């Protein structure tokens, strides 16, 4: 999975897909009451990027629904995963539950259209810190209460704050989540980051019977040398400002026979058995 990073304006979707991404990450900004308003990162952000691009969240969902719906004129078949980077750290933890309700309802109304949409992308909920786990509870409660619990099959969980992996596991246990879990490891492209935690996540992913990590990705990679390092370690995905660079690295002799781009037929919740 090549995840285009910070794809917050509607016109950027095609831009990143044209560069080779098969997944996109966009930032969800909330008001003080936990209501999702816009797709927007804000300052500061990655080096060399404009941080201020934005869209109305519901309008963004309306567009991305078309881009991921078979037979729609806007369909881009390669786009199979949507990562929602939830900016919960900007609001009170007491509002995390309300935020989860709101995002679930907006996805129901504007993406899935309560069963009337054929939009097919998988959804990854990126939670910044384990203290905001009530967002996940609320999201699942809302799908159940609204009568659309089946959409849980399309939704995965990912904690992005580089916290202790055992602490993350404990929170997942509290929530009763034992599947459909990704684990991110990374830092803004402005800085270097070691591989200790990334290696630990990969080791847990590959441990037989360990159900709290199905996929691991590294972010935000812009240098080919770091992309190569991550691929050698065996990541499932890379988040990048430059998907075209990832494509070029994947075509190199060292990687061409070991990796390929994920398609809709690849289940993002299953561990890869090479």
Swiss-Prot record:
Paired cysteines (S-S): 45-51, 47-190
Listed GO biological process terms: killing of cells of another organism; lipid catabolic process
UniProt entry keywords in alphabetical sequence: Cytolysis, Dermonecrotic toxin, Disulfide bond, Hemolysis, Lipid degradation, Lipid metabolism, Lyase, Magnesium, Metal-binding, Secreted, Toxin
Top-rank EC class of the record's enzyme: lyase
Keyword Iron: no
Compartment(s) where it occurs, according to its Swiss-Prot or TrEMBL record: Secreted
Binding-site residues for Mg(2+), renumbered to this chain: 25, 27, 85
EC numbers on record: 4.6.1.-
Co-factor remark: Binds 1 Mg(2+) ion per subunit.
Tissue note: Expressed by the venom gland.
GO molecular function: lyase activity; metal ion binding; phosphoric diester hydrolase activity; toxin activity
Annotated catalysed reactions: an N-(acyl)-sphingosylphosphocholine = an N-(acyl)-sphingosyl-1,3-cyclic phosphate + choline; an N-(acyl)-sphingosylphosphoethanolamine = an N-(acyl)-sphingosyl-1,3-cyclic phosphate + ethanolamine; a 1-acyl-sn-glycero-3-phosphocholine = a 1-acyl-sn-glycero-2,3-cyclic phosphate + choline; a 1-acyl-sn-glycero-3-phosphoethanolamine = a 1-acyl-sn-glycero-2,3-cyclic phosphate + ethanolamine
Residues at the active site: 5, 41 (nucleophile)
GO cellular component, one term: extracellular region
Cofactors that this protein relies on: Mg(2+)
Keyword Methyltransferase: no
Family per similarity comment: Belongs to the arthropod phospholipase D family. Class II subfamily.
Role description: Dermonecrotic toxins cleave the phosphodiester linkage between the phosphate and headgroup of certain phospholipids (sphingolipid and lysolipid substrates), forming an alcohol (often choline) and a cyclic phosphate. This toxin acts on sphingomyelin (SM). It may also act on ceramide phosphoethanolamine (CPE), lysophosphatidylcholine (LPC) and lysophosphatidylethanolamine (LPE), but not on lysophosphatidylserine (LPS), and lysophosphatidylglycerol (LPG). It acts by transphosphatidylation, releasing exclusively cyclic phosphate products as second products.
Protein name (record): Dermonecrotic toxin SdSicTox-betaIIB1bxiii
Organism of this sequence: Sicarius cf. damarensis (strain GJB-2008)
């Amino acid at each position: 999975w090549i995840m285009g990073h910070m794809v917050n304006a509607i016109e950027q979707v095609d831009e990143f897909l044209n560069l080779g991404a098969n997944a996109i990450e966009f930032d969800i900004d909330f008001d003080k009451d936990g209501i999702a308003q816009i797709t927007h990162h804000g300052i500061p952000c990655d080096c060399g990027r404009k941080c201020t691009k934005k869209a109305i969240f519901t309008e963004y969902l309306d567009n991305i629904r078309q881009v991921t719906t078979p037979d729609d004129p806007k369909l881009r078949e390669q786009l199979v995963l949507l990562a929602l980077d939830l900016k919960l750290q900007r609001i009170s933890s007491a509002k995390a539950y309300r935020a989860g309700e709101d995002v679930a309802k907006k996805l129901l109304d504007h993406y899935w259209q309560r069963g009337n949409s054929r939009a097919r992308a998988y959804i990854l909920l990126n939670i910044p810190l384990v203290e905001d786990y009530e967002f996940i509870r609320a999201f699942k409660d809302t799908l159940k209460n609204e009568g659309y619990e089946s959409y849980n099959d399309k939704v995965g969980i990912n904690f992005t704050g580089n916290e202790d992996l055992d602490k993350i596991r404990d929170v997942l246990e509290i929530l009763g989540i034992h599947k459909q879990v990704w684990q991110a490891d990374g830092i803004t492209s402005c800085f270097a980051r070691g591989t200790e935690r990334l290696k630990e996540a990969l080791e847990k992913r590959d441990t037989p019977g360990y159900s709290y990590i199905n996929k691991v990705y590294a972010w935000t990679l812009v240098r080919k040398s770091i992309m190569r390092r991550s691929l050698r370690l065996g990541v499932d995905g890379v988040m990048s400002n430059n998907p075209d660079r990832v494509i070029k690295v994947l075509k190199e002799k060292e990687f061409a026979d070991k990796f390929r781009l994920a398609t809709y037929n690849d289940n993002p919740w299953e561990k890869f058995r090479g």
